[in-house]
Amino acid sequence: MLNDETAKPFVSLLAFDKEEAIGHILFTRVYFSDKEVSPMMHILAPLAVKPIYQRRGIGGMLIKEGLHLLQAMGSEVVFVLGHKEYYPRYGFATHAAHLGYLPPYPMPKESEVYWMVQPIGPTGYEVGKGNVKCCDELNRPEHWRNEESDR
């Protein structure tokens, strides 16, 4: 995704323990597919921490620092498709579609809770609403489906 022009500007952060990389987070650009002009918005994907370093707050530190850097860049809104109990601890609201932010691909109703949003700019939720489109690399159906949704 780092070579995908539609992902820019992006934020990529690594967490280290001495010289060993133990965690990574990436935020890439997203757009409203149904609008000619979109505010600067991003999606968090992926976040990974090596298993032996999990449950130590490393993922949370990466999220907080990433959101801080995005806010400084002028990003207005950040999305994530993830764990419904983890990401709300860092300010994400579940059911982003109910707030007017539709995911890139349709989701089963029971999965809508995992599509989340967090306004980080001064306009908050007034930034606009619409169908979210990810950078080209992430905007593939296989990234937005699971086995159950295919049945």
Describe each PLM feature range.
Residues 14, 26, 43, 48, ...:
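Conserved beta-strand segments that form the floor/walls of ligand-binding pockets within enzyme
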Residues 27-28, 62-66, 96-102:
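Short acidic (Asp/Glu) patches
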Residues 31-44, 54:
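A conserved beta-turn-beta hairpin within the catalytic core of GNAT-like acetyltransferases
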Residues 44, 49, 55-68, 79-80:
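Conserved acetyl-CoA-binding loop-helix of GNAT-fold acetyltransferases
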Residues 72-76, 82-109:
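Conserved active-site alpha-helix within GNAT-family acetyltransferase domains
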Residues 103-150:
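C-terminal "cap" of GNAT-fold acetyltransferases
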